[in-house]
Amino acid sequence: MLRCAVKKFAYFATFLTIVANIYIYTYPSFHPEQCSWNCSNKNAPLQKDLTFVDKVKNYFSDVREQWHGSHASAGNDEDIHILAFGDPQIKGIWPKTPYVSRLDTYGNDYYLGHIYDMMQQRLKPQVVTVMGDLFSSQWIGDSEFHNRTKRYISRIFKRDPTSIENIKQQNLDEKGQYKANWPEWGDRFNEILDNVKENEADNQELSFGFGYENIHSWNPDLEDFLIINITGNHDVGYSGDATYQHMTRFHDLFGKDNYWIEYETNTTHPWRIVVLNDLLLEGPALQPEFVEATWIFLNQLNERKFNGSTVLLTHVPFYKREGLCVDGPDTRYYPDAHAPESYKSGLLRSQNHLSESVSNQVLNMIFENGKPGIILTGHDHEGCETVYNKKSTSTWEATKNIESDVFVKEITVKSMMGEFNGNTGLVTGHFNTDSMTWEWTFSLCPFAIQHVWWFAKVSLLVTIFTWSSLLFV
């Protein structure tokens, strides 16, 4: 009797396990339009217009294409393919963290890693970018920052952590843990900053080394794509919080926070990636020299008079009126009696958007040539799509639709966290040989709430255990 009941349960558990695991390993095929690179076939019927039978056929057809790797080669070979992930915000584990929370944090790393694995294997992007807020808090010690970086690199993005381990060995404290050498980094930073300011009139770029050209991978021996990590407020803080310690450890473990990479500059279709730490554009700032350095970066970028298209990657969205996105404009400052950090009184504490004046300045400097481009941001976990239309007064107005001959799209990439359904942003850049301009399209590929991933994994363990138990009943 017991054996019969266990066997029935084993069959039921097996069925659920198969269904759940098929879903988590083929979920992009349930949204083939959203989870594939944009291609030139504009006549294909939309998924929402198909019958149920046609949707099922599309699903199996897409699974077959994924199995054979057809999605990675979809479209024109000259197209640009970028995967964008919003605000993973991975949490930490502390000595008093309950075991259930430890397990949840451990599983969350692999939930996020599953999303990346599926999309990377399916689409083989040229660029992968994470839109800031890599971690859940900037108020963590250096050793914890290193620990989370190692988890982030190895568990989520399956990269070799050897380089950050080497950095740790070069910067050990008395307990053998990583400690950011911010006095040395700060001295070097200020030496460079002073040098740039002295030679500003001569436009010499001997210092921060903001510019690169035709970089397709930071480590070509290990990776055939470029990965870019943007600074978020939970990584380095807003300008009223950002310290030398914050900036040193980010530079140590992730690299520069401001730079550009130019591609195809001697062709008819040049384009570039601009990485901007827009957390350090406004103040009042705790370290005003950080803001000064960011504006030096923008001035040097503007002086290049680049004539191609721009992909701008940054964290905080540009100014827009209330109602266009979930997050409206909201800027806050530390009060005068902010204990125990009275030295922060009046400094910038948080902002949902850049201010209107700074937004106009930055957009005019980066998109001065009037060429089509695209902006990718994070910060607003719900995501948003807007268009910035340039007016005759050199101001930019955010709307939902194109209202000007000169415009740029801003995509706030919806968070990849489980509570927001584990999203991936897909950007396709296609050069139109008729208009001789780049065209940029975006789609959002959702996965599912993290409990679905957990169910698939737990159900597999339950199924194995149940079938094994039949040996003893």
UniProtKB/Swiss-Prot annotation:
Regions of this protein lying in the Lumenal compartment: 30-451
Keyword Membrane (UniProt): yes
Topology of this chain in the membrane: Multi-pass membrane protein
Glycosylation sites: 38, 147, 229, 266, 307
Side of membrane Cytoplasmic, spans: 1-8, 473
Entry keyword Zinc-finger: no
Cellular compartments annotated: Endoplasmic reticulum membrane
Keyword list, A-Z: Endoplasmic reticulum, Glycoprotein, Membrane, Transmembrane, Transmembrane helix
Cellular component annotations (GO), alphabetically ordered: endoplasmic reticulum; endoplasmic reticulum membrane
UniProt cross-references to Pfam families, sorted A to Z: Metallophos (PF00149)
PANTHER family reported for this sequence: METALLO PHOSPHOESTERASE RELATED, PROTEIN TED1
Reported function: Acts together with EMP24 and ERV25 in cargo exit from the endoplasmic reticulum.
Further comment: Present with 1070 molecules/cell in log phase SD medium.
The protein's name in its UniProt record: Protein TED1
Organism, scientific name: Saccharomyces cerevisiae (strain ATCC 204508 / S288c) (Baker's yeast)
Source lineage: Eukaryota, Fungi, Dikarya, Ascomycota, Saccharomycotina
Gene: TED1
